[in-house]
Amino acid sequence: MEYLEKNHLVKTTEEEYQQFARFYSDISRYLNLSLTNEEVHIIAYDRTYNMNNYIVYPDAKEVLESLTKSYMMGIISDTWPSIEKQLRAIGVRDYFSISTYSCSFGKFKPDEILYKDALSKCGCRAEETVFIDDSIRNLEGAAKLGITPILIAANPASDVDSPYLKIHSLLELLR
């Protein structure tokens, strides 16, 4: 994580690709994988440009379609510049009015700058806002600012004890 934190301020998809090429090259050396430069670049290219690598939660489109009728939706994501293309490829980008991406700040959740940026962009007060995530650590960051946190425990790794409201499916947001 230290490597990513030191090298996460990335503005373009090409910078992202180069960053992952360096990252995979370093990992190859560290783990003695003996990957060739060509193999490293193939892996980095696939990670950056292959939109088939990404999936959404089951029922995400249905839930987003319903929620956008009554609520302004935003996204705060620990991610890279290719996220915009990824969200469009999976058909969910247009549900979000605002977006805050960690790569634009060189910081990861739960850094408060990400939550504050999203609040500023949407013109909402923290008390009027809900933040859904699968990480308790990220929820704590939102809660410290007065944002209502909800844990989505859609997979076993995120189904942990939580002081926050917990859902197991996005469909639960519609109830």
Question: What does each model-found stretch correspond to?
Answer:
Residues 70-72, 146:
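Glycine-centered short loops/turns at secondary-structure junctions
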Residues 75:
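Phosphate-binding loop of NTP-binding sites
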